[in-house]
UniProtKB/Swiss-Prot annotation:
Protein's name in the database: Ribosomal large subunit pseudouridine synthase B
Reaction equations catalysed: uridine(2605) in 23S rRNA = pseudouridine(2605) in 23S rRNA
UniProt keyword Magnesium present: no
SUPFAM superfamilies: Alpha-L RNA-binding motif, Pseudouridine synthase
Similarity comment: family membership: Belongs to the pseudouridine synthase RsuA family.
General function of this protein: Responsible for synthesis of pseudouridine from uracil-2605 in 23S ribosomal RNA.
Keywords assigned: Isomerase, RNA-binding, rRNA processing
Active site annotation, chain numbering: D110 (nucleophile)
Domain S4 RNA-binding: 3-63
RNA-binding recorded as keyword: yes
Originating organism: Salmonella typhimurium (strain LT2 / SGSC1412 / ATCC 700720)
GO biological process: enzyme-directed rRNA pseudouridine synthesis
Length: 291
């Protein structure tokens, strides 16, 4: 069965359909050696060769590809990029290896932010979840440094002007602390760059700690150590798909038994420790090379 080329490429995680349409129009995509044009349809077979900028890419039939989603506890210090030219650790380093697919990050967290980061094998799901029109809630626990009064909280709820347009927290709730070091839980329905930090800075308050604790109704899993991941079960995956009007999955790679749905904590901690040692050595080596 043939499908639109941009749909096949979006499913494989190479961008949204609109982004891929632009790539096709620019003549950057070839199918079996011929430059593709917008509107082309392809039938995914073992012999199909699709290239973007000359690089052969892997695609699968829709029926073959199971939508998988990971919840990852991103530590501070990791970059949301696949490869870093300086050799710094990235969020992709510790994810499980895949054959014939790849993990796609659902949004980004800046290098100094930790917490929940979702990954999926379904490019269309990732792009829809990230799109501002879907208004998927993101909740953050924020430790702030500075005087916070009712006037500032009111401004943050009603909206302040940032350099890229007006912004506001959907909800803001005090959650502990004393003096000028206080914790708040805030929610947003978009994912602009450093938006939480910039909102607080707009009212003269600095963020000293930032943790994403929820994406939609998916919380940061309890007991998951920093640098650890767990795969979402079928119900959670279909909840996310339903949020963005995608059809439900009918199968999952996650075992039914609860104790098999998550890597054991001690296994994850060993993996985290091992990765930290490797990353530490890599950074030391980088300093010596630059020094």
């Amino acid at each position: 069965m043939s499908e639109k080329l941009q749909k096949v490429l979006a499913r494989a995680g190479h961008g949204s359909r609109r982004e891929i349409e632009s790539i096709i129009e620019a003549g950057r995509v070839s199918v079996d050696g011929k430059i593709a044009t917008l509107g082309d349809r392809v039938e995914v077979t073992p012999g199909l060769k699709i290239r973007i900028d000359g690089h052969l890419i892997s695609v699968k039939e829709s029926a073959e590809q199971i939508c998988r989603v990971l919840a990852y506890y991103k530590p501070e210090g990791e970059l949301c990029t696949r490869n870093d030219p300086e050799g710094r650790p990235t969020v992709f380093d510790r994810l499980p290896k895949l054959r014939g697919a790849r993990w796609i990050a659902v949004g980004r967290l800046d290098v100094n932010t930790c917490g929940l980061l979702l990954f999926t094998t379904d490019g269309e799901l990732a792009n829809r979840l990230m799109h501002p029109s879907r208004e998927v809630e993101r909740e953050y626990a924020v430790r702030v440094f500075g005087q916070v009064d009712e006037s500032k909280l009111r401004d943050l709820s009603r909206g302040v002007q940032l350099e890229d347009g007006p912004a506001a927290f959907k909800t803001i709730k005090f959650s502990g602390g004393e003096g000028i070091n206080q914790w708040y839980n805030v929610t947003l329905t978009e994912g602009r760059n450093r938006e939480v930090r910039r909102l607080w800075e707009a009212v003269g308050v600095q963020v000293s700690r930032l943790i994403r604790v929820r994406y939609g109704d998916i919380p940061l899993p309890k007991g998951l150590p920093r640098g650890g991941w767990t795969e979402l079960d079928l119900a959670q995956t279909n909840y996310l798909r339903g949020l963005v009007e995608l059809p439900p999955e009918t199968s999952s790679k996650v075992a039914v038994e609860k104790d098999r749905r998550r890597m054991k904590a001690n296994q994850i901690r060993r993996a985290v420790k091992r990765h930290s040692q490797i990353a530490g050595g890599r950074r030391s080596g980088g300093r010596n090379n630059n020094g």
